[in-house]
Each structure stands twice: as structure tokens, then as C-alpha cells.
Amino acid sequence: DHRLPSIVKVTSGSTPEIAEVVDQLYNQIIVAGTYKAESIRVAEAAKVIENTQRDVNIALVNELAMLFGRLGIDTEAVLQAAGTKWNFLPFKPGLVGGHCIGVDPYYLAYKAQQLGYSPQIILAGRHINDGMGSYVAKQLINLMSLKSLTILNSKILVLGITFKENCSDIRNSKVIDIIEELKNHGANVSVCDPCADKDEVKNILNIDLLPINEINISDYSGILLAVAHEQFLDLNLQLAKDRVIYDVKSQLDIS
């Protein structure tokens, strides 16, 4: 459980004396302890590369998922097999949003470009992850086509609007890219998210959320699990077996 007290806190200060005060302050609440960086610049850089590394790793598995899709290989099966090795990092493909992982790499890239250096891997990762919403929508459309289901005027149910599972934060959520792509192809999209604040979603994204207890699975030609909230994992999808179900996070039991 990665909560504030259980994560080592990197601290620093503008002077050695202030750095010590800050470090002692955090030590009062951080059970895992603190790490006093030698300067604020080092502490800030450490935080930025932490999120950038995660962004790049997710971009790698996203690209692999797109490749395996073309090869007709189950990405989840490949990751499970590769995960038997002690040195394999267990990242999964998915949408990268929020106010940290999808933003911090741009800080680093901007500073690098100010100094005359063009970061290749960082920006390549951002390019891949920023395009995943459109990719997911097109995958759903292609799967519907294979079942002779027309996307124009079809009813699509998108499960989840927040940027990650089991949280209410909608900042920089890439699910909106999926919704817009589906709408651009003429679909009628319903969105359900029991974790999100319906008023906030309406005010910021102009989307009316469908209450989870009003979902009628058989009404939809396509169902897309965008965010793996715990409430969604208990949905009975047996009525949707003749429809298209796209599970971004490979969490649903649709056997």
C-alpha cells in the first residue's frame, strides 16, 4: 500500500540548515524514512525522472502491445511469460494521464531543449502514450467491424473517465480522447464512472455520467473498459457475449 507514510521521502533545502529542518519535519510523519538530497535541484530532478522513467516504460509496453496486436499474439500472455524472469519490469499497456506521469516528462524535455539538446526517448514515449486514446478507439471500431457491427449510430458504453483506477481525479484523463474518437466516427457514447464526481465531469468535460445501476449491458454494441475501477469488475457481461468487449487493462472476466 503506497501511502505517504510508507514511501521514502526525498528532502532538501536552500541551505544545509533549512535542509535539516525540512528533513526532520518529514521524519515525524514518514515511517519509511527520508533521503536528504544534496540540493533542491537534485531533489527536483529525482522526482522528474521518477515519473519520466515510468512514462517511458509504459510507452514501451504500449508499443509492444500494438506490435503484438498486428502479429496476432496475446499481449497479456506475453507479459505473464516474460514476468517469470527476475529482472523483467512488470509494466502493463494502458492510458497515461493525470498531473504527474504525463506532465513531468515535458518539464524535462523543455529544459533540455532550452540547453540545445533534443531528448529522443522522452519525447518518443510521450508521442506513443498521447496517441493511445485514439488507438484504443480504433481498435474497438475494427473489432466491431469484424462482427459486422456498424459504428455509425451505434451505442457504445465506456467504463471509466478518471485517469486511473479507484480514484476520482479526471485531470488529463486520456479516456476523453477515446470518447471523442468514437463520436467522430458517429457513435453514441455513454460513460459510466462511479468514482468520478458527476458535477465536475459535466462542468469540465461536458459529459453526463450514467449511474452504474442504470447500465443495461444488452443495449450496447460495444463495451470498453477504460479504467479498471473495482465496481466494474463485478459487472455481469454474459449478456454482451455477442457484442464487442474491449478491456484496456485486461481485468475483466469475460470467459
Tell me what each language-model feature is.
Residues 1-255:
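Structural/interface elements that position substrates and couple domains in central-metabolism enzymes
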